[in-house]
């Protein structure tokens, strides 16, 4: 059995902590059993291990998110990288082609696809095991996990599953045949479905590899992994729920009525963090039910605030009533700003300033934080030069095949077209000033370099 964890998202509903590159599943705000803070994705992987479902875990994710996953997840985890965000159907299609061709999995292999940010307890994973058994018994082509609604509010961001009664009414763990699947219905339809006993779709799909491969070829033609990868960015954005599950007639669902929560708004997230303040924060008088998270060096002082969330990062500052924080995405859509903080496989960087001058020249200043033992790849830039000032730590620098040691106080100018790389001996901090007329992350060409 193989598990595919879907990791995507644009990070708008928890702005400014999340952004286009740091999605909500990577925010390390949740209390973990060992007393530290963990992210949603760390929590899910930990629970899979605890429940004996960690043998073959694969993340379907973007290249940018892969770096963050590598930083947060330790262990034998495999990655299926998507060239672009094209929706759940292309992501699952690319994943099953990878398992078939690159992992040499048999057509009879059972595949479990699930989100990487489900906030659940361990009973949820018992329900997953039941769903796996239903598929392995060939009782249905696809087995879904249906959540017993915990609210009569007709949420339209969920799919709804309308199912027959269990074959064995005395067994609440028995599966049910699905009568119809509704992907994100209108509010009046959702309200009726809840009254009729419909279940929320948990985004879990269990199937046999061979069945899904047949569907991939129906949807994308006579393709293979390399072919689909090469034209991935040209594919339309396609929903697996809408394109496949809504049209499939051979569906089963396993019911689950335990803890299941979408931490997609500030209000829902803060209910589970057990934190009132984080960072450089001062609480004044008459502060009630207010949460403050500050990633900036400057202090935040709150006085007389009631039922508020305040969050400050390099990307911006949010001040919102908790009860309307769920509408944040629509406002963030109107913001046209680049992410000011990004995690990479080698560490992280923070944008300090981004200037444009009268003649069109630009200067972008970053603080690079490289973890000891990690390195930035051997690369060139065609449209910019970089001035590196080493402000802390020690490392090794190579420029055009010439290797030297670097330490605090060293300053190096790297011109456009020069090959360069750096490796941190200790934790290394660099102030990088990029200069040019075209300062974009895509201006990079990588080459091989062996440090030893």
Regions found by a protein language model. Give the residues of each.
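N-terminal glycine-rich phosphate-binding loop and ensuing alpha1 helix
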Residues: 1-69, 75-77, 81-86, 94, ...
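C-terminal structural segments of small proteins and small subunits
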Residues: 431-439
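Catalytic metal- and UDP-sugar-binding loop of GT-A-like glycosyltransferases, i.e.
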Residues: 6, 114, 390, 433
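Conserved beta-loop-beta/alpha segment of the NTase-like Rossmann-fold superfamily
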Residues: 74-169, 213-220
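Residue-level signal for inorganic ion chemistry
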Residues: 41, 95, 117, 161, ...
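A short, charged helix-loop
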Residues: 163-196
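Left-handed beta-helix
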Residues: 207-413, 418-424, 439, 445-451
